[in-house]
Amino acid sequence: MNQKHNVTAEKLGIQLSTGTLAGLAGGAVTVAMGETTVFVSATAASTLRPGQDFFPLTVDYREKFTAAGRFPGGYFKREGKPSEKEILTSRLCDRPLRPLFPKGFLNEVQVIGYLLSTDQINEADVLMVNGASAALMISDIPWNGPIGCVRLGEINGEFVVNPTNEQMYDSSLDLIYVGSEKEMMMIEGSADQIPEARFVEALEFAHQVIQEIISAQCELAELCGREKKEFELVKTPDQVLDLCREITGNRMEEAIFAPSKQERQVAVDAVKEEASKACEEKFGEDFDPDHISMAFEIIQEEVYRENILIRGKRADGRAPADLREITCETGVLPRVHGSAVFTRGETQSLVLSTLGTSRDVQDLDGLTGGPAAKSFILHYNFPPFSVGEAGRFGFSSRREIGHGALAERSVLPILPPEDEFPYAIRIVSEIMASNGSTSMASVCGGSLALMDAGVPISQHVAGISTGLVTEMNDQGEIAKHVVLTDIIGAEDHFGDMDFKVCGTRDGVTGFQLDLKIQGLPFDIAKEAVKQVTEARMKILDKMDEALPSHRKELREHAPRIESVQIDPEKIGALIGPGGKNIRRITEVTGANIDIDEDNSGKVRIYATDTEAMNRALQEIELVTGEIEVGKIYRGIVRGVKEFGAFVECLPGKEGLFLVDTLQLSLIHI
């Protein structure tokens, strides 16, 4: 039986243990913080799939209902497809792990995490990342870790490490930081327009904090780590690579500097086809088409990087810090509540905003705690035609969910408080064309669509992505680098970094960093933040030219929401016996009425147009009002007796008029 080992990062309150569960996995670790516990395993396939030309890493995180002492909903009473949160946590874990596997290691690797228990106080995503790193460290899988992960908040100007769910309500920062011993590996999160200088301070602070969990993983690996296996590393045969270089010559450089993305791809494919025929003739039965694809990846990367590092020349002719041409249009569609088209180079997003009522909010059934619902949603759709292809369509991919979440948390900080603007808001970004940074186009288009809908945001939010091209020395350190602003798809693919930063003129609202190299030095990170801030201001200038402030009125077809305060003692009168009065008002006006359950007397009215809203307000005033002496009312005679008439002056309020008080010349009974 395996021996149990425990290590603890005391300041962080995180405990790592192994030796109890999953003894046959490559590596298995249980991570706990408070009473929240996550199990993570890491296992690699022993053989390579035939024709494998990419690294098949799969990271899956699942939350078990048993962790919260609950039954799954639905007929089958079993966990189903992964939730949005599970997908986002899986992606969060995948991104910092991937760059640390050896180049050429293409065996399938599975990292699987389960939420085993939750105290609904401590979040599990940070535990998943630390557990995955620890599982790989003690496994037989080659991996250049460890990494440490921490969540950082800021409350009243002070950084808070791994804040609880309750503390996050008061935090102006939600930073998830992942780093190695010396450098950062991945960041993501949001902030309430935090200044760039403070943002960098948060990164440096978080890097110091993770050192304890990194040391704990190293200690665990020393106690029980398995010997690393020798796996076959896939490499392009030198003779194939040399022949392809000989055939392409300078033609590859000519191909990648074609005017458009499609022309570049056509030119590269033509050169590739010629090289493929030459290799087939030379190598005969030993010819492998996969080797051609791998060789051309290497050659294209060399040409892209050489031109940027030596000549400062990018594929589309821009200098490293240049933006592509930007155009902004608003109000592009009828009837919708808000619409905008944001175009940057060959990237284009059609963004639509819709206003709804409190009945349209999205309920959140988070097992680990947090908000019960959210009234702002941003959905991102990436159809295959946006890259000129035919492909899978109809279901949201993990990538679409991840990009939508990034854009959503970047726009959220600029929205007005719900007590000032009590609408549910949904933004949908339809990507019409893609050549890099579509998620950032969604942020810019989303801001324009909000203003076009009349949502009272004080200023625009914009986003842009920076890339990086590096040259390493013999010690594996960065000897030369160039930071690129507004990267296109090829620069993302062949480059070393994708660093997205969103914000207003006042500060940062959202961010995400992904790397292909094994760490980003802080001096380069600071350079990238400075460069992306300058670019963001230029984008905001363009957006302000298109629509400098929000529309003063909501669109004609947008719902109307009003709040009125009534005497709490009149709530019963408004509802009526068995809900009679409130049903009548709804039927007569077409408006929906919600009464706060706290007996405060706050009433919300939801109507499809202004006329229905005014009628509903009038009806509520009549029902909850008092009959005033000396005021003339137009009433309805509800009953007539010999001694007088019963008259309804206000809804539900009748009075008796005696015959001897009526001064009428003629009364018909």
Task: Give the residues covered by each predicted segment.
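Long, basic N-terminal domains or extensions that often function
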Residues: 1-232, 287
